[in-house]
């Protein structure tokens, strides 16, 4: 199994190019199933989850071609001949549930194995299923598979989301694009990745309005054509590198990114005493060589503070001046990085869905284990600033969501290497 060896006490400084957003690339790749003509995508990140999605699409009969130009992918779903996303591919990635709605909407049937992915608590597919049922689908759970069928086209419906869910919002949008009549999603997720997926679908001929608000309307059309689309920059990768500068006394410019998708994170970094400069396509954080100040965090759906930045800010708070509280309202069981940080000398305790962090001046290198994608990057960054050597185990989690992470960190001055047992 591959691991990272990180030599600490690095001040991370320089410029880093931000990749396309995984959380936009995955739904957009699955949404390409809806198109009868080829689609060209650019700025697609080279990640394990993207690779898994390619495999699922190919299994369905989609032609997926990666161009020589990095990040450019041609998708042709004109000859889909299979309607089952099998367990051996789906088991590693929860996002594979997004194959169901486009298969059902275009071909009136689909089967997806119940998915896997990060072990950060309950992420049930119930909201995906109930939304499809309201549009006329017949759903059954059989031997670990979600099987969906519909006689003719799905029917537009008014769907209220009991809980804000990015995944379910995207599933219903995909289903509604080819449905008969109008679908209205109330209490919809507002994340930038939902907006990007809607822009992509509209470029293919869908009629979606309201994406980015809590009420999204979709007027069904009979077919979708091809298009060309560029995936939005990864706001979570951007935030991760900004935190890297803040905790290491460094200065990092994130290039090819957008500040308007990261306002809650930028506000908290400024509250922590960091100097931030913004241009149209870059964000620079200068720590001015100062230790960050502790900041209280409460994760919320967009435009609130993103849960995918919680682990990175936990790290910031355990090395900050002062005491802070971090409350996780989105996912249960998402503090598994804290016991690992404690092994490195952090002082923190967990009370229910809240972590209390008492800032210390220094962390010490240790052997630690990654438990999920965002927790794993916080441990790597902790290793960059700790004294001595840190070994991070189970780094396959990082490869699911961060493109060329060790190469990018080395470009900023980190001393990090990948090795196998």
Swiss-Prot record:
Gene Ontology CC entries for this record: cytoplasm
Binding of phosphoenolpyruvate, residues: 22-23
Enzyme class: transferase
GO MF assignments: UDP-N-acetylglucosamine 1-carboxyvinyltransferase activity
Principal location listed in the UniProt entry: cytoplasm
InterPro entries with a match to the protein in the record: Enolpyruvate_Tfrase_dom, Enolpyruvate_Tfrase_sf, MurA_subfamily, RNA3'P_cycl/enolpyr_Trfase_a/b, UDP_GlcNAc_COvinyl_MurA
Binding site for UDP-N-acetyl-alpha-D-glucosamine: 94, 163-166, 308, 330
Keyword Zinc recorded: no
Taxonomy, superkingdom: Bacteria
GO terms classed as biological process: cell division; cell wall organization; peptidoglycan biosynthetic process; regulation of cell shape; UDP-N-acetylgalactosamine biosynthetic process
Subcellular localization, as worded in the UniProt entry: Cytoplasm
EC code: 2.5.1.7
Catalytic activity field: phosphoenolpyruvate + UDP-N-acetyl-alpha-D-glucosamine = UDP-N-acetyl-3-O-(1-carboxyvinyl)-alpha-D-glucosamine + phosphate
Range of residues in the leader sequence: none
Catalytic residue positions: 118
Protein keywords: Cell cycle, Cell division, Cell shape, Cell wall biogenesis/degradation, Cytoplasm, Peptidoglycan synthesis, Pyruvate, Transferase
Pathways involved: Cell wall biogenesis; peptidoglycan biosynthesis
Family: Belongs to the EPSP synthase family. MurA subfamily.
Function of the protein: Cell wall formation. Adds enolpyruvyl to UDP-N-acetylglucosamine.
PANTHER family assigned: UDP-N-ACETYLGLUCOSAMINE 1-CARBOXYVINYLTRANSFERASE
Name of the molecule in the record: UDP-N-acetylglucosamine 1-carboxyvinyltransferase
Source organism of the structure: Mannheimia succiniciproducens (strain KCTC 0769BP / MBEL55E)
